[in-house]
Amino acid sequence: MNKLAILAIIAMVLFSANAFRFQSRIRSNVEAKTETRDLCEQSALQCNEQGCHNFCSPEDKPGCLGMVWNPELCP
């Protein structure tokens, strides 16, 4: 396997793990505070890609986009 393919696999694994952590955190935050969601969480839950870019911090943006691009969560 060439180096580029290995790097692509590593990037996909890291992206998936980050999206999973973000999704888990959003679920726990939604359960804990249903009325005071921040704009980044609202963007993810409403499948709003532009909202992810506008309202999420750099560390939360990949997780938000991962949820928006997931066809099971945002058809």
From Swiss-Prot:
Gene field: MAT10
Main location: secreted
Subcellular location: Secreted
InterPro entries linked to this entry: Pheromone_Er1_protoz, Pheromone_protoz, Pheromone_protoz_sf
Residues of the propeptide: 20-37
Lineage, broadest ranks: Eukaryota, Sar, Alveolata, Ciliophora, Intramacronucleata
Keyword Secreted in annotation: yes
Subunit field text: Homodimer.
An example Gene Ontology molecular-function term: pheromone activity
Any Pfam family hit: E_raikovi_mat
Signal peptide feature range: 1-19
Origin: domain of life: Eukaryota
GO cellular component: extracellular region
Function: Mating ciliate pheromones (or gamones) are diffusible extracellular communication signals that distinguish different intraspecific classes of cells commonly referred to as 'mating types'. They prepare the latter for conjugation by changing their cell surface properties.
Name of the featured protein: Mating pheromone Er-10
Paired cysteines (S-S): C40-C56, C47-C74, C52-C64
UniProtKB keywords: Disulfide bond, Pheromone, Secreted, Signal
